[in-house]
């Protein structure tokens, strides 16, 4: 029997290489197809997305801050089958001595680890990020409508969440915008030179785009109630707020929040605990550093 020549060996090697490349391309194409197929199955609602996908309207107690404020915060979110950590930053810019204000905020980086059960329920691809996951940029524009010690303090706002967040395939951030308009009302119930107690409420309209070919957007009511107490440099607050969508597909999250902030020489530390209710499945712990100017 004659041994294979060098030319025959080379041809055989090239055939095996070609076969291997074909198998790799087939697997890659299948993976890409699976990823794109899964996005059609995603449910664009707070229940079936990550902890930061649907920002909640903020409560200012009817009074806009008169100072610049820069905040850096770390959040730790927990639910059954999902552990999420993130780094958040914001900048509040007062306008016309506090009669208006603009806030720019967002999640700089998100880290997450989900179970396979949560991944499958959300129709996600991965259980943890294979590339860095960045959050959405949110822009809030506020205006002080009324400021009255006798009656009440009232602010209105227009807000936009951009579609800049990543990892849609893992159901972390949507590829669509959210926008909302709300009214904040607050009134001081009791006050001394060093302490005060205020009642606050929020009502508004919240809307986000979806991937549903029939219902292209979900229109919702946003609401909230809260109580804030202040003594010298210490501020304690508790709020209850949420969103009430009309599709009933996990679009009705609520949350209780308890926050403590202590300020010293324009530097403040804040701690917050959030208990998610109904379609908000997360508990969250936060620690913030705020610098006032």
Predicted regions and their residues:
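Cleavable N-terminal export/targeting peptides
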Residues: 1-47
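Transmembrane beta-barrel outer-membrane domains
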Residues: 80-84, 130-136, 172-178, 194, ...
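Transmembrane beta-barrel domains of Gram-negative outer membranes and organellar outer membranes
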Residues: 31-162, 177-184, 234-239, 256, ...
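Detector for outer-membrane/organellar transmembrane beta-barrel domains
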Residues: 174-245
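Residue-level detection of beta-strand scaffold positions
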Residues: 142, 150-152, 195-202, 222, ...
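Outer membrane beta-barrel transmembrane domains
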Residues: 115-117, 121-127, 214-215, 221-293
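Sequence/structural signature of outer-membrane beta-barrel proteins
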Residues: 73-81, 109-113, 146-148, 160-170, ...
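Short acidic/polar alpha-helix capping motifs at helix-coil junctions
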Residues: 20, 51-56, 222-223
């Amino acid at each position: 029997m004659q041994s294979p020549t060098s030319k025959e060996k080379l041809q055989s090697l090239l055939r095996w290489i070609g076969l291997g490349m074909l198998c790799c391309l087939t697997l890659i194409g299948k993976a890409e197809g699976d990823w794109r197929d899964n996005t059609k199955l995603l449910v664009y609602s707070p229940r079936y997305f990550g902890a930061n996908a649907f920002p909640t309207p903020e409560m200012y107690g009817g009074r806009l801050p008169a100072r610049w404020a820069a905040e850096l915060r770390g959040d730790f979110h927990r639910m059954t089958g999902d552990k999420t950590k993130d780094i958040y930053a914001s900048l509040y810019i007062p306008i016309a001595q506090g009669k208006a204000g603009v806030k720019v905020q967002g999640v700089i980086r998100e880290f997450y680890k989900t179970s396979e059960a949560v991944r499958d329920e959300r129709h996600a691809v991965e259980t943890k990020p294979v590339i860095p996951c960045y959050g959405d940029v949110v822009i809030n524009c506020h205006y002080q409508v009324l400021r009255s010690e006798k009656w009440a303090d009232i602010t209105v706002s227009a807000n936009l969440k951009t579609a800049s967040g990543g990892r849609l395939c893992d159901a972390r951030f949507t590829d669509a915008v959210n926008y909302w308009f709300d009214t904040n009302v607050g009134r001081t119930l009791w006050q001394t030179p060093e302490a005060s107690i205020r009642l606050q409420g929020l009502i508004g309209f919240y809307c986000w785009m979806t991937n549903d070919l029939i219902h292209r957007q979900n229109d919702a009511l946003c609401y909230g109630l809260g109580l804030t107490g202040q003594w010298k440099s210490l501020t304690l607050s508790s709020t209850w707020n949420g969103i009430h969508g009309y599709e009933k597909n996990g679009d009705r999250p609520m949350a209780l929040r308890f926050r403590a902030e202590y300020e010293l020489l324009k530097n403040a530390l804040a701690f917050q605990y959030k208990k998610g209710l109904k379609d908000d499945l997360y508990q969250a712990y936060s620690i913030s550093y705020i610098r006032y100017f």
